Regions:
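Cysteine protease-like catalytic core of ubiquitin/ubiquitin-like
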Residues: 7-190
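Predominantly extracellular/luminal regions of secreted and cell-surface proteins
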Residues: 1-5
Length: 190
């Protein structure tokens, strides 16, 4: 996805969360939160996209920390689990409190406005494509990610994602071919 973002000319807009760093297995909540907080602070992107593996099902989260908004995508139309909501809410809260404190310190202001930054992130569950089968969830996540990047989406999520119909078989086939080619390219480079 980083290459797609580079080709689209918006690499400075989109950041990507490493799936293994936000999963429930193998990471503590503290480690996952630290990873997200550090990545948002250091990379300074507007939008962060993350593939999240919940059990055996891939889902997607889009974080807009400056807007205090999180967008949720699930091809089974499940709600986000409490683990993910917790680590993201705390990470976004920290990001906003830190950013406001930094601005206040630089401007010599008091931090009375910090109470505004303490509101939890607003979660938007979009009406996204619903998968028919049981194994194509990862392709749905890749479809949504590439759509967001190539169309340069940063707001009005409910206007863009309004179609609950499954992806067309031709689109799924194209995604499979695209990612198989990419995998082979990376494999041959190593």
């Amino acid at each position: 996805m980083t290459e797609t973002s580079m080709r689209a000319g918006n690499i400075d807009v989109y950041g990507f969360l490493e799936p293994q760093s936000i999963q429930r297995s193998g990471q503590s909540q503290f480690e996952s939160e630290n990873y997200i907080k550090n990545w948002m602070q250091n990379s300074k992107r507007d939008v962060y996209l993350g593939a999240y593996l919940n059990g055996a099902h891939w889902q997607m989260v889009v974080i807009l920390p400056k807007e205090n908004v999180v967008i949720w995508f699930c091809s089974l139309h499940n709600k986000p689990d409490n683990y993910l909501k917790g680590i993201i809410n705390r990470s976004v809260l920290f990001f906003n409190i830190f950013a406001l404190a930094l601005v206040s310190a630089l401007k010599g202001l008091d931090d009375t406005q910090q109470s505004k930054s303490k509101t939890p992130a607003r979660w938007i569950v979009v009406k996204c494509n619903r998968q028919k089968g049981s194994t194509e969830c990862g392709y749905y996540v890749m479809h949504w990610m590439s759509t967001i990047i190539l169309e340069n989406f940063k707001n009005n999520w409910e206007m863009y994602f309004i179609d609950a119909r499954p992806l067309e078989p031709e689109r799924l086939k194209a995604l499979r071919i695209q990612w198989a080619k990419y995998y082979l390219k990376v494999k041959n480079e190593t």
